[in-house]
Design a protein with these regions (language model features):
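Short phosphate-coordinating micro-motif centered on Lys-Gly-acidic
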Residues: 36-41
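A cytosolic small-molecule/anion-sensing beta-strand core signal
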Residues: 31-32, 50-51, 71, 96
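Cyclic-nucleotide recognition modules
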Residues: 65-124
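Phosphate-/nucleic-acid-contacting segments
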Residues: 143-187
């Protein structure tokens, strides 16, 4: 996905503001298995994903519990770092070889102060993430595992080809056996 499209999907910026943001955002590549962020460490980076797939997870009872997937067009960063200048609680691992656009969190904050359009872009992004978090919370609290699976497939149509079933079942909060039953039921 092109960086212009990624930026505009969040909030359309005037060309001068977009160029100011792009001047600070080089393209980087990392291999499958690379961790963009590690739990309990403060990070100085903010990423926009051009190509690839990743998951965010925490450890609970020595098991990885996935709570979010990222794909092309998504912004990736620990909320605690970006908004509270604290270490994040999550690990974010690439599930495929990936191409990203990398931006320093300090530089992003400087751009927020220097350009009202970029500040509004950041605000719109934060609003969008709050809505996503609320939807995820409601899904986890009130939807069945079948409904959560259907939502996941609607949001990530190619996820079964890109993500191991163990990670998908972790995200859904079910066993791989239960995931297999759900998949068999809706085929």
């Amino acid at each position: 996905m092109d960086i212009y499209d990624i930026i505009d999907n969040i909030y359309k910026l005037p060309l001068a503001s977009k160029e100011a943001l792009l001047n600070e955002t080089p393209e980087v590549t990392y291999p499958k298995g690379f961790h963009l962020f590690l739990a309990n460490r403060k990070s100085s980076k903010f990423y926009l994903m051009k190509k690839g797939m990743l998951h965010a997870y925490i450890y609970k009872s020595d098991k990885k519990v996935t709570f979010w997937f990222g794909k092309e067009g998504d912004a990736i960063f620990p909320l605690q770092t970006l908004y509270n200048n604290q270490a994040g609680y999550e690990n974010i691992e690439l599930l495929e070889d990936s191409v990203l656009y990398e931006l320093s969190v300090d530089k992003l904050h400087d751009l927020y102060l220097a350009d009202i359009h970029i500040a509004n872009w950041g605000r719109k992004f934060a609003e969008r993430e709050c809505i996503k978090s609320e939807q995820l919370f409601i899904s986890r609290q009130f939807k069945t595992s079948l409904e959560r699976y259907q939502d996941l497939i609607a949001d990530y149509p190619d996820i079964l080809q890109r993500v191991p079933l163990g990670i998908i079942s972790s995200y859904l909060g079910i066993s791989q056996v239960s995931l297999s039953r759900i998949r068999a039921k809706i085929r």
